[in-house]
Amino acid sequence: MSYLFNNYKRDNIEFVDANQNELIDKDNNVYLDFSSGIGVTNLGFNMEIYQAVYNQLNLIWHSPNLYLSSIQEEVAQKLIGQRDYLAFFCNSGTEANEAAIKLARKATGKSEIIAFKKSFHGRTYGAMSATGQKKITDQFGPVVPGFKFAIFNDFNSFKSLTSNNTAAVIIEIIQGESGVLPADPLFMKQLNEYCKQKDILIIVDEVQTGIGRTGKLYAHEHYQLSPDIITLAKGLGNGLPIGAMLGKKNLGHAFGYGSHGTTFGGNRLSLAAANQTLSIINDADLLNDVQSKGQFLIENLRKSLVNKRNVIEVRGVGLMVGIEVTNDPSQVVREAKRMGLIILTAGKNVIRLLPPLTITKKQLEKGIEILTEII
């Protein structure tokens, strides 16, 4: 008997321990992790982060946002660098997107936001309403009004939906949940230029793509894009719950006293994890290594799977990789688990790989070998 709602399709396995890039179940079986807890433990189970959280645990766990927090300032500075942003901390990606939606509407005085079909931005009401998947929004009654949905990578589709009441566009640089679908560079260039011309805010959802996942701190850096608002979570706390919304300083007037808030946002334990995570990831050598390992993974998967009739395409950026297949990918996930490899699905027919950024070449080779055997 379970005391939990049945809203997750749980596998009959429980992980009780971990060692860097490996997971250990209650029967002491060891698994190579190509999921990072769905893009969360980007640095694996890292002892430096453990020590940072432990040190904070010995000081103060929580204090309300009615008082100063030097660790919030420190993490914000690491996220912002030389960019002209301000930061708001929350607990998750969906909360970061809720904050972005509120900021965009209040700052512009406009209500319409353009999102994209097949997108995913979260499951709370505002973020769910911005999600372009009916399976996410069905059966929950009326969604938040004001959202329109364009075809991803189709500039004319986007442009046709804009109006004088368009506050913002919200976009994932790579549509992760729908199949690891990267944005087209020309499309992003056209969208960026048009939005700047029309004073439409650009919200980039970096919840899954941010914090080094693609070999840049932020995936939008691959496109020379300067978003008005950035949302973050997942890898930011390397396993501890935290989200963040970064907004351009010229939007700061819209979030004055009492305009938005959260009880647990900026929690000191989560910030301690984020602080150490960013200290490690904000390193050019590490990020270059992610790009190199991502290229190695994609190229070798393409070579190994070239004669597999059920493989349509291998695609991705950095260590965010999708293998599109003709059959049900959940079969591959089950077989991979049996052989000691933890992987994910995305969309209807994509195997999603999100290994830790600290994955070794030898571990990548092992994963490729297993996938080649079972696909």
UniProtKB/Swiss-Prot annotation:
Note: May also have succinyldiaminopimelate aminotransferase activity, thus carrying out the corresponding step in lysine biosynthesis.
Keywords of the record: Amino-acid biosynthesis, Aminotransferase, Arginine biosynthesis, Cytoplasm, Pyridoxal phosphate, Transferase
PROSITE patterns (UniProt xref): AA_TRANSFER_CLASS_3
Protein name: Acetylornithine aminotransferase
E.C. number(s) listed in UniProt: 2.6.1.11
Quaternary context: Homodimer.
GO molecular function: identical protein binding; N2-acetyl-L-ornithine:2-oxoglutarate 5-aminotransferase activity; pyridoxal phosphate binding
Cofactor binding, note field: Binds 1 pyridoxal phosphate per subunit.
